[in-house]
UniProtKB/Swiss-Prot annotation:
Organism: Synechocystis sp. (strain ATCC 27184 / PCC 6803 / Kazusa)
Annotated disulfide bonds: none
GO biological process: photosynthesis
Highest taxon in the source lineage: Bacteria
Binding site for heme c: 45, 48-49, 85
Alphabetical list of SUPFAM superfamilies matching this protein: Cytochrome c
PTM (free text): Binds 1 heme c group covalently per subunit.
Signal peptide (from-to): 1-29
Any matching Pfam family: Cytochrom_C
Keyword annotations of the record: Electron transport, Heme, Iron, Metal-binding, Photosynthesis, Signal, Transport
MF-aspect GO terms: electron transfer activity; heme binding; metal ion binding
Protein name per UniProt: Cytochrome c-553-like
C-alpha cells in the first residue's frame, strides 16, 4: 500500500512540475498553427516517425494527443530521454505549432 501511495505522490509531483515549468507554460499559452506545425514535423520528425506520422523507426503518432497530455508531449520532445529520439529545442511558438499539428492526427 505504501508503494502505491508513493507512486501516486510521485506522479502528481511530476505532473505538477511539468505544468509549472516556464517553457511549458509559455507553450501552452500560445495558439499553435497546424500548418506550420506540419512543416516543423516534416523537417524534424518525419525521418523517424514517418512522413504520415504512422511510425517508422519511432512510433506512430496518430492519436498521440488523446493518449498523452500536452505537457507530456512537450517534455518528450525537448528532453531526449527516450533513445533513440534526440533532444529538440523548438522555440515556444514552434512547439505550440507542433502540438496543434499533432492534434490533427
Amino acid at each position: 500500500m505504501a508503494g502505491i501511495v508513493s507512486l501516486v505522490i510521485l506522479a502528481v509531483a511530476l505532473f505538477s512540475f511539468m505544468n509549472f515549468d516556464p517553457y511549458v507554460s509559455q507553450v501552452l499559452a500560445l495558439k499553435g498553427d497546424a500548418d506550420r506545425g506540419r512543416a516543423i514535423f516534416q523537417a524534424n520528425c518525419a525521418v523517424c516517425h514517418g512522413i504520415q506520422a504512422d511510425g517508422y523507426i519511432g512510433p506512430s503518432l496518430w492519436g498521440v494527443s488523446q493518449r498523452r497530455s500536452q505537457s507530456h508531449i512537450i517534455h518528450q520532445v525537448v528532453s531526449g530521454q527516450t533513445p533513440p529520439m534526440p533532444q529538440f529545442e523548438p522555440n515556444p511558438q514552434e512547439m505550440a505549432d507542433l502540438l496543434n499539428y499533432l492534434k490533427t492526427l
